[in-house]
Amino acid sequence: MRNAIATVLLGLAMLLPVGAVQAQDGPLRIEITDGVIEPLPFAVPDFIADTPAAAQYATDIARVIAQDLVGSGLFREIPKVAYISPYTDFDAEVNFTDWKAINAQALIAGAVSLSGDRITVRFRGYDVFAGQELGAGLQLSGTTDGWRRIAHKVADTIYSRLTGEGGYFDSRVVFVSETGPKNDRKKRLAIMDYDGANVQYLTNSDAIVLAPRFSPTGDRVLYTSYESGFPQIHVLDVGRVQRRVLSAGNGSMSFAPRFAPNGQTIVYSQSQGGNTDLFSMDINSGNPQRLTSAPSIETAPSFSPDGSQIVFESDRSGTSQLYVMSASGGEAKRISFGQGRYGTPVWSPRGDYIAFTKQNAGRFHIGVMRTDGSEERLLTASFLDEGPTWSPNGRVIMFTRETQGASGQARLYSVDISGRNLKPVKTPDGASDPSWSPLQN
């Protein structure tokens, strides 16, 4: 069962033609025929509420779990109108025959109880055709205003048990919220759940903000602000919404920051005297270290997961291309050789791919390549796609898509690394420059 779906994900990652896969330890399966995924059908009845006050939470939690799994593209929810018998008792023995009859290959069952402002959720997953649980049942608790996080955690658990890979639902995205006409657009930092819920604004000035980037622990955000009249790097504590300037003065402009995996070092671009190079800095000491020294423009740096290397874009060859070098500087190796211009590279948290923006023949693309530049694949194509960011499990990419025309509205989209399951991400206003957090604790 788990082997079947894990094999599917491996096939997606390697983009190999995969036929129907039969699990060795049960009948649960996902079919891939000629590169088309056959989502696994599952049922998630409304969770059982112990009191009338818990009823809405029970319904909403089941709904969010289903949305998470369906949104991954690997699962298909069976409509509740197809259920043969109602689900009314969490502790009763499951009637697998009724669920088999509607071809529910997985069943997710749960119960919700309230005590003051606290909510407790118990849940179990079942392999219907094998007639057994998908691992031990679990219990999660929290405050009632955190019920969505509990739902995401349940979905992550089910996703992980069925695929053998980490989930990505209990995560957040920081981005630039855009309002107003194109020639007078207000840009604010905002943060939300990965699915667009619970939007909060982190800045509220008229100064332009760009390129927010999460720390490895998700509690801080680097970004570029024009509050002083020229670009400077700020770091913001998400929980307390406190910020401080990390780069300032000396006639230089600093931008495109990103954290190292250790959370204490940052790498960024600095422009001075008409030249743009890469620098690193310890955020506690504030002492910069030059990493490149060339007459070309070096920008958009991103660390490898182990912190040993940096990928960045440079026009040293005459056009914008991607290069990899040691995190301490030194000789850089070019890894992009296709037609067009490359930019905004970002290393996958798994370490296996680098995502990038490509411009060629009047179109923009989000693509991925191996870390040595091999196996380049373009996942999207439009008037303007740019700025990829990886999900915590390295299987999904979120990016900015801007529409053509006078309004030039920017929105967020996501796509899996096979190029399938392209879809918009819900935001209340225009949105750009996303950065995906790690899974929350």
From Swiss-Prot:
InterPro entries xref list: 6-blade_b-propeller_TolB-like, PD40, Tol-Pal_TolB, TolB_N
GO biological process terms held by the UniProt record: cell division; protein import
Record key words, sorted: Cell cycle, Cell division, Periplasm, Signal
Top-level taxon of the source organism: Bacteria
Subcellular location: Periplasm
Region described as Disordered: spans on this chain: 420-441
Transmembrane spans: none
Pfam family, one: PD40
Record carries keyword Glycosyltransferase: no
NCBIfam families, sorted: propeller_TolB
Subunit comment: The Tol-Pal system is composed of five core proteins: the inner membrane proteins TolA, TolQ and TolR, the periplasmic protein TolB and the outer membrane protein Pal. They form a network linking the inner and outer membranes and the peptidoglycan layer.
Family named by the database record: Belongs to the TolB family.
Task performed by this protein: Part of the Tol-Pal system, which plays a role in outer membrane invagination during cell division and is important for maintaining outer membrane integrity.
Name this polypeptide is given: Tol-Pal system protein TolB
